[in-house]
Swiss-Prot record:
Gene giving rise to this polypeptide: NT5C3A
Domain of life: Eukaryota
Sequence intervals crossing the membrane: none
Gene Ontology cellular-component terms listed: cytoplasm; cytosol; endoplasmic reticulum; nuclear body
Family indicated by similarity: Belongs to the pyrimidine 5'-nucleotidase family.
Any GO BP: CMP catabolic process
Keyword Magnesium: yes
Reactions it catalyzes: N(7)-methyl-GMP + H2O = N(7)-methylguanosine + phosphate; a ribonucleoside 5'-phosphate + H2O = a ribonucleoside + phosphate
Compartments reported by the entry: Cytoplasm
Active site: 83 (nucleophile), 85 (proton donor)
Alphabetical UniProt keywords: Cytoplasm, Hydrolase, Magnesium, Metal-binding, Nucleotide metabolism, Nucleotide-binding, Transferase
Record's protein name: Cytosolic 5'-nucleotidase 3A
CDD domains: HAD_5NT
């Protein structure tokens, strides 16, 4: 065989090898891309908390990208913005509904039976509207204002005593989510700002976390706070009403707080409603924001909507495991 023939055969063989190697590389790339667009990603694969059936993620690649950004930024850049009722507190325990901050008062001995019935009627009427998947936030908005104003008026009529609130919380069935000690203590240890933005009753909320031993100095609460007269009797509520669907306005009113945290451009947001998605609207310099949503009710009707708006959706999940696992990577 002459040299030209040998060279030709070598070229063909070389081309075949290149094609084969190229095919392997392409296959590897396609496999990697498929994996990235699938449910799991490298970081999430390493986190057993993400493998639970309660965890739903529409875009794992995006979640990995955000978590990588949070890890890179570390403690110095992080802040937490969170709802309270049914987000930090439990929705249910052993099949029984747990109370919200308002419910703690509604169910207490400070309220007459007649008032309790009226409050329950309001809840039955308006809660159905709050979680109705067929209504927009704009359509729900006036009903929420109506509900809160009527409920607060009934509470004012009862002449609630400030010095009884601690006892009322102690006697209630309120429970914080599993893993709350680790969540609050780790954030306190690293001095990470925690902004609790609640449409509940601030006095009750503060008492709950105080009694749980987690009301640390890094925690700021913005909520509906009671206004008491000189005798400690409820006479009204301070400031403008915060309800589940006007947190955007409230967030903008707290821009001074967020300005002080201008270097904390990475956010983990936790909520349980569509209204909670706007809690970070007062932050001007967001670099990375991871939105974690708890879906507690009407799962079949609302799951798709929640997955479209929250990065991670936790269905009927009564723990802070996922948030804690992310904090473990960052801090």
């Amino acid at each position: 065989m002459d040299r030209a023939a040998v060279a030709k055969m070598g070229a063909v063989a070389s081309a075949s090898v290149c094609a084969l190697v190229g095919g392997v590389v392409l296959a590897q790339y396609i496999f990697t891309m498929k994996k990235k667009t699938g449910r799991k990603t490298k970081i999430i694969e390493m986190m057993p908390e993400f493998q639970k059936k309660t965890v739903h993620i529409k875009d794992p690649g995006r979640v990995e990208e955000i978590i990588c950004g949070l890890i890179k930024g570390g403690a110095a850049k992080l802040q937490i913005i969170t709802d309270f009722d049914m987000t930090l507190s439990r929705f249910s325990y052993n099949g029984k509904r747990c109370p919200t901050c308002h419910n703690i008062i509604d169910n207490s001995k400070l309220i007459t039976e007649e008032c309790r019935k009226k409050l329950l009627q309001l809840k039955e009427t308006y809660y159905a509207i709050e979680i109705d998947p067929a209504l927009t936030i704009e359509e729900k908005y006036p009903y929420m204002v109506e509900w809160y104003n009527k409920s607060h008026a009934l509470l004012i009529e009862q002449g609630l005593q400030k010095d009884k609130l601690a006892e009322v919380v102690r006697e209630s069935d309120v429970m914080l989510k599993e893993g709350y000690e680790n969540f609050f203590d780790k954030l306190s240890e690293h001095n990470i700002p925690v902004f609790i933005f609640s449409a509940g009753i601030g006095d009750i909320l503060e008492e709950v976390i105080h009694q749980a031993g987690v009301y640390h100095s890094n925690v700021k609460v913005v909520s509906n706070f009671m206004d008491f007269d000189e005798n400690g009797i409820l006479k009204g509520f301070k400031g403008e009403l915060i309800h589940v669907y006007n947190k955007h306005d409230g967030a903008l009113k707290n821009t001074e707080y967020f300005k002080q945290l201008k270097d904390n451009s990475n956010i983990i947001l936790l909520g349980d409603s569509q209204g909670d998605l706007s809690m970070a609207d007062g932050v001007a310099n967001v670099e990375h924001i991871l939105k974690i949503g708890y879906l507690n009710d009407k799962v079949d009707e609302l799951l798709e909507k929640y997955m479209d708006s929250y990065d991670i959706v936790l269905v009927k999940d009564e723990s802070l495991e996922v948030a804690n696992s992310i904090l473990q990577k960052i801090l």
